C-alpha cells in the first residue's frame, strides 16, 4: 500500500477491461507505458519499476482486479463495474466508490479505518455522519540494526473517543499506512485533517459532505455563546478553537475548506461587527513534527491578501 494517483488506477482498470483475462501483470505495465499512462505528472518521464509495482498491487489489494493463474480479470462486483462503465477520469462519484472500497477492505480497516468506527459494520455514509476522530503524533525510539543504532520516527495513531491506538513503528508500516491508506482516503476526499497546535498532533476525521454554511452558522453561534457574558460587548476567539469544537464536540465535521469559506463569508458580511486579527510570524513558523506539517497547521488560519494570516476574530455580541 503506497501513494497512487487514482486517475492512473482507473486508466489501468480500463486497460484490464479491454484485455480481460488475457494479460499478465507485467504485460499490463508494458501496455500502460506504451500508452503513456505511467508518466510522472511533474516531469513527464516514465514511472520507475517500484511505483508501477505499487499501482498493480493497489489494483489487486482493493479488489479492482483478480489475479487468476497469473492473468488479470476484472472484478465483477457492482462498484467495479460502475467504475469502468464511464470515462477513466476521476470524479466525485468515483471518489465515493473508491472510498467505500478502502473502508470495506479488511487490511485498511484493521490498520487505519477501525480507529474511526463506532460500529465495526459501519458503511461509508454512516461513518461520515457519525464517527470518532484520530490524532497522529510522532515519537522517537531506538532501533538496532547491524549492531548500529538509528533513530526512527514512528507515528502513534490514537482514537481518544474509543480509547484505541495503532503504533506505526517501521518504515514499511509508515509508508503503507500513513502515506498509503491515509493518503488514499485524503485523495478521494473521504477524510480531512488539520493541526490546531504543532504539539497537539495532526487531527484526522471523516468528512460529512452534507454540512454546508447554514448548518455551520448555527454551530458557530452555539460556539460563540460559550464565550459571551452580559457585561461584554466584544469577545476575541481563536480560530483553531472553533475547528476543535467542530471536530471534537459535534458531528458537523465539514471539510476544512468549507469551514474556512464559511468564516470568510461571515467576516465579509459583517465587517462592522467582526475584526480579523493577524497571527504573529513566530507562531505561524512554529516548529512542527511531521514532514509538510506546516501546511496542515496553516490550514487552521484564514489568509487575507491585505493583512496576511488571521488567527483571531473580535466579534460583537449583536451577531449571536
Which residue ranges define each predicted feature?
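Hydrophobic, glycine-enriched assembly/anchoring segments
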Residues: 289-320
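Donor-sugar nucleotide-binding helix/loop cap in glycosyltransferases
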Residues: 1-284, 307-319
Amino acid at each position: 500500500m503506497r501513494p497512487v494517483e487514482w486517475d492512473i488506477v482507473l486508466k489501468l482498470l480500463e486497460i484490464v477491461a479491454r484485455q480481460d483475462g488475457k494479460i499478465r501483470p507485467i504485460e499490463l505495465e508494458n501496455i500502460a507505458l506504451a500508452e503513456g499512462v505511467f508518466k510522472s505528472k511533474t516531469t513527464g518521464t516514465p514511472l520507475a519499476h517500484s511505483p508501477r509495482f505499487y499501482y498493480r498491487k493497489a489494483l489487486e489489494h482493493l479488489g479492482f482486479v483478480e489475479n487468476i493463474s497469473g492473468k488479470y480479470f476484472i472484478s465483477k462486483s457492482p462498484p467495479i463495474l460502475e467504475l469502468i462503465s464511464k470515462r477513466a477520469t476521476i470524479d466525485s462519484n468515483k471518489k465515493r466508490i473508491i472510498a467505500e472500497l478502502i473502508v470495506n477492505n479488511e487490511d485498511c480497516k484493521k490498520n487505519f479505518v477501525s480507529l474511526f468506527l463506532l460500529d465495526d459494520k459501519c458503511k461509508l455514509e454512516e461513518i461520515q455522519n457519525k464517527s470518532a476522530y484520530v490524532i497522529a503524533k510522532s515519537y522517537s525510539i531506538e532501533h538496532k540494526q547491524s549492531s548500529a543504532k538509528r533513530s526512527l520516527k514512528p507515528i502513534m495513531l490514537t482514537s481518544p473517543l474509543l480509547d484505541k491506538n495503532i503504533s506505526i513503528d517501521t518504515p514499511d508500516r509508515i509508508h503503507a499506512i500513513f502515506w498509503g491508506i491515509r493518503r488514499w482516503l485524503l485523495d478521494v476526499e473521504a477524510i480531512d485533517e488539520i493541526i490546531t497546535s504543532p504539539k497537539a498532533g495532526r487531527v484526522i476525521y471523516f468528512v460529512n459532505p452534507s454540512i454546508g454554511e447554514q448548518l455551520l452558522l448555527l454551530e458557530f453561534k452555539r460556539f460563540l455563546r460559550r464565550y459571551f457574558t452580559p457585561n461584554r460587548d466584544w469577545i476575541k476567539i481563536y480560530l483553531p478553537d472553533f475547528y476543535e469544537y467542530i471536530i471534537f464536540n459535534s458531528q458537523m465535521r465539514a471539510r476544512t475548506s468549507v469551514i474556512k469559506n464559511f468564516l470568510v463569508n461571515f467576516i465579509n458580511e459583517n465587517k462592522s461587527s467582526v475584526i480579523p486579527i493577524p497571527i504573529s510570524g513566530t507562531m505561524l513558523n512554529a516548529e512542527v513534527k511531521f514532514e509538510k506539517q506546516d501546511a496542515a497547521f496553516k490550514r487552521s488560519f484564514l489568509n487575507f491578501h491585505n493583512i496576511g494570516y488571521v488567527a483571531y476574530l473580535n466579534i460583537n455580541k449583536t451577531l449571536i
